[in-house]
């Protein structure tokens, strides 16, 4: 049997005024990805699948996001906002190409799944002309009701037009639809705007399908899957649902979470086996954590790769470009950025490692700072395998510390250090026997006039 081709049109032209934000609504994020990205990633892909995104005239950023997520996406502009059917027909050129299945979705429903799109296509394979996604909200007030007779959809009745009996129906319209591509354009072009707002409503397609003697049907899904985002409160609710999904998926994959509700994940986080995540950890986009790694409490990771049996935290911040080798350790109050830390290396306390490469087995003492920025550009620090950096050292980049080299505590290193060498760069220690006693005696007699280290007692 030949695989059916598909066109998915994602409507993303809404202004989103209730978000109270300068950011287009569909670019707000859930689990580290834009609302639009979640929908695009759920849409069919691969051979025979095409994608179109309808944007507003002033939303170049939305077009750019669509191309970032799905380079195969075509974008079309809805220059006037005249209803959902009008928005779909902005992509008339794509529809006319004649895919077998036409899917219509919304860019502000980030919880919809690929499986739901596939279920919505099944009635088309079975001969239906139109399939509408339905759901049962806790409170159906305000939603269009789906009127079903004999297993077929006969109408979508808006709340204002519904009879008292129809308002008792709990099956509601989610807005997501699938059309048989052979008849989709003809049906869409028959939708008129004879209503109080003068707009073209996609819901009118049901009546047109019925008038043509064709079949419309309903596929039901959960209310969460079609949760639309119009306010910041709804955005937070969607985040909570997504985080619950991600946590459960991680737990089912074998990740140990001591307090799952305190852990926040990104949609693209990947885990190996026997990973442990302690409480109050935030994992942003682009993080992969290999087998046996432990992420201790109160750590924050973004765009970082964690090797097997590595350890992070507690209270660590791993910024983009961090790569932690197998068995390496990042300890408490350590920040890394664009740092490659090879297997077995240790950065245990109170340290900043930026634009650096640390060799295998190196030890970075507490309070070490890689001074990577000169006010104009970033510079690289290279620390060889097995090197030992004493506590409270400053490494002024660009600089290379050779393999096996030792850096004395408190040093400021601005020149390269050869392999196996010792480098010390600090003021010499001076000891004056009895000075402290004489100073205290002088103070007690009121002879010391200042509050600093006074005059030297001779």
Swiss-Prot record:
Residues that bind Mg(2+): 108, 230
Pfam (any one): Hexapep
Listed GO CC annotations: cytoplasm; membrane
Region listing for Linker, in residue ranges: 233-253
UniProt-listed CDD domains: GT2_GlmU_N_bac, LbH_GlmU_C
UniProt record, GO biological process: cell morphogenesis; cell wall organization; lipid A biosynthetic process; peptidoglycan biosynthetic process; regulation of cell shape; UDP-N-acetylglucosamine biosynthetic process
Keywords: Acyltransferase, Cell shape, Cell wall biogenesis/degradation, Cytoplasm, Magnesium, Metal-binding, Multifunctional enzyme, Nucleotidyltransferase, Peptidoglycan synthesis, Repeat, Transferase
NCBIfam families assigned to the protein according to its UniProt record, in alphabetical order: glmU, PRK14353.1
Protein name: Bifunctional protein GlmU
Gene encoding the protein: glmU
């Amino acid at each position: 049997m030949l695989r059916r081709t598909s066109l998915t049109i994602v409507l993303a032209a809404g202004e989103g005024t209730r978000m109270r934000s300068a950011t287009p609504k569909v670019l707000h994020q859930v689990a580290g990805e834009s609302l639009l990205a979640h929908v695009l990633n759920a849409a069919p892909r691969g051979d025979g699948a095409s994608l179109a995104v309808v944007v507003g005239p002033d939303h170049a950023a939305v077009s750019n996001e669509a191309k970032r997520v799905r380079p195969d996406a075509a974008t079309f502009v809805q220059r006037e906002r005249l209803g959902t059917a009008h928005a779909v027909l902005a992509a008339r050129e794509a529809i006319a190409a004649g895919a077998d299945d036409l899917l219509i979705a919304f860019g502000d429903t980030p919880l919809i799944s690929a499986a739901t799109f596939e279920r919505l296509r099944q009635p088309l394979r079975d001969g239906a002309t139109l399939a509408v996604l339905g759901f049962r909200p806790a409170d159906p007030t305000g939603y269009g009701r789906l009127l079903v007779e004999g297993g077929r959809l006969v109408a979508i009745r808006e709340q204002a037009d519904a009879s008292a009996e129809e308002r008792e129906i709990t099956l509601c319209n989610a807005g997501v639809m699938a059309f048989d591509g052979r008849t989709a354009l003809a049906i869409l072009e028959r939708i008129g705007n004879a209503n109080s707002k003068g707009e073209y409503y996609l819901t009118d397609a049901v009546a047109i399908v019925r008038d043509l003697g064709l079949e419309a049907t309903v596929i039901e899904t959960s209310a969460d899957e079609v949760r639309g985002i119009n306010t910041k409160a709804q955005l937070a609710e969607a985040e909570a649902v997504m985080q619950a999904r991600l946590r459960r998926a991680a737990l089912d994959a074998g990740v140990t979470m001591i307090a799952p509700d305190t852990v926040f994940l990104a949609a693209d986080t990947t885990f190996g086996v026997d990973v442990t995540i302690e409480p109050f950890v935030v994992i942003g986009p682009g993080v992969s954590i290999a087998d046996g790694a432990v992420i201790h409490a109160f750590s924050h990771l973004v765009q970082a790769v964690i090797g097997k049996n590595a350890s992070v935290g507690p209270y660590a911040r791993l910024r983009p470009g961090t790569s932690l080798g197998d068995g390496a350790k990042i300890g408490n109050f350590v920040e890394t950025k664009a740092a490659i830390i090879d297997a077995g290396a240790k950065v245990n306390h109170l340290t900043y490692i930026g634009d650096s490469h640390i060799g295998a087995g190196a030890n970075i003492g507490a309070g070490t700072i890689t001074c990577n920025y000169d006010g104009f550009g970033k510079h690289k620090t290279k620390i060889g395998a097995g090197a030992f950096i004493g506590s409270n050292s400053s490494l002024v980049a660009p600089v290379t510390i050779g393999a096996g080299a030792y850096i004395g505590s408190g040093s400021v290193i601005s020149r390269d250090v050869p392999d196996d060498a010792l480098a010390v760069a600090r003021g010499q220690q001076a000891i004056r026997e009895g000075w402290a006693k004489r100073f205290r005696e002088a103070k007690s007699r009121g002879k010391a006039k200042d509050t600093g280290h006074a005059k030297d007692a001779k």
